[in-house]
Amino acid sequence: MVKDFYHQHVVEALIKDGWKITHDPFYVPIGNRRGYIDLGAEKSIIGAEKESNDGLQQIAVEIKSFISKSDLNDFEGALGKFQLYFFALEDLEPDRILFLAIPLGFYNRFFNDTFFTKLIRRANLKILVFDEQDKTVNLWIK
């Protein structure tokens, strides 16, 4: 399995943000086939507004680099992959939240278009925006 260009950047950003990487990659059965979400991670939650039943928040992260010549083609592929993994994960681990990790540079140039900001809401897309230079998490869009 080939890792995305920014794979290690996202791993480091999540660790800096207090997450423990539990799966690299995270295997997900898709029908009779195998799918691999880039990462699985968990974080102990402290504080009332983030508390869950067992005090643990679990996520899966699909990383996309968006470094080809066409942002739109990259996004179409990422959205399709996100939806496929979302439905597979819903059956396997319904409490684990799936995020699409995207670089800050791509986020700034692509999501200034209201069409795509509406699409995030309509498609229930969860996004983790990471700074590809600092290797930090900049924004969680839930």
For every predicted segment, state its role.
Residues 2-7, 11:
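Nuclease catalytic cores
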Residues 20-59, 74:
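Active-site metal-binding core of divalent-cation-utilizing nuclease and nuclease-like domains
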Residues 63-75:
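Short beta-strand-loop-alpha-helix junction that forms the active-site gateway
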Residues 72-95:
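Basic, amphipathic alpha-helical patches used to engage nucleic acids or provide basic targeting signals
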Residues 87-120, 130-132:
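Nucleic-acid nuclease catalytic cores
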Residues 121-140:
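Charged, structured surface patches that assemble and position nucleic-acid processing machinery
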